[in-house]
Every structure is written in structure tokens, then in C-alpha cells.
Amino acid sequence: MSTGWIVLGVIVILVILAFGAYNRLVTLSQRVNQAFADIDVQLKQRHDLIPNLVETVKGYASHERGTLDDVIKARSAAVSAQGPGQVAAAENQLTGALGRLIALSESYPDLKANANFQQLSNELSDLENKIAASRRFFNNTVQEYNTGIQQMPAALFAGMFGFTRKDFFDLGASRAEVEQPPVVKF
């Protein structure tokens, strides 16, 4: 066999490996994008629920203006956040503000007994559980993608094709506070 055939064989193998690595990385990248879109759907539902919850609380605890304003500001920041890092930080703030809003019900028995408040609180709790599940799926998908771009032979081609590490949906320093959905007691 001549050297030319050997070189051609090596080039063909490298091209096949490059195509295979590229296709796998595209698939993994699309999974990450879809997983983030799933989180986004849940967050939008939560954002839509918040104005009703604030209005219900306002009817019973209108002098708790600071807490209500905090929730409204946190919601606005969360709605306008872009990308996993910003969204996670904004949602972290919103979760804290919502926890304080729900805690107000302890001080207002009439609010706590209100059927609309109970329904909205239950919906919020359900959404928090769905968000937590979506977040876990997203982070697992990101882990799979990040591992994929570091494994051979994809690691040889990942940078060349523009595939870079993706960030986890991280809750930051106060992770313990928001790891579990807010507890809603009636």
C-alpha cells in the first residue's frame, strides 16, 4: 500500500469522526435548549399566577405594601431576564419574595381561609414542583452536553465547531432556602 492511500484513509476516518462528533454535539445542544424552554414554560405560568396572588393578598393585607412591592419588582425582573444565569438569579429573588408573601397568610386568618388564596397557593406549590423537576432535567442535560464536548473524539472538534460549556440553572448562595418549594399551610 502506498503512503497516499494511508493518508487518504486517515483523512476519511478523521472526516467521519468529525461528522459524528458534530452531529452528536448538535443533538446534545438542542436537548439543552429544549430543556431550558421547558423551564421557561413553567416560569411563565408562575409569572402569570403572581398578579392574581398579589391582588388577593392586597385585599386582606393592603398595608403590607413593602412585601407586595417586592413581589411585583421581583416578578418584573424575572420576566425580563435572559439566559439561564440571569433567569436563575431573578427566579431566586422571586422565590424569596413569594415565600414572604405566603408567610403573610399566617398573620391574616381571613386571607388564609380565602378559597381563592388557597387555590392560588396550591397552584403555586404545584408549579414550584414542576419547576424543580424541569430544573433537575435541565441540569442533567447540561451535564451530559458538557461531558460530551470534553470526551474524545468530540473534544478535538468541539471548539472548532463553536461548542462551548453551558451553565447550569444554579440557584446561587441561598440554594438551601429555595431548594424546596415554599410550604403552604392552611
Language model features by range: what are they?
Residues 1-186:
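A helix-centric hydrophobic-segment signal that preferentially recognizes long
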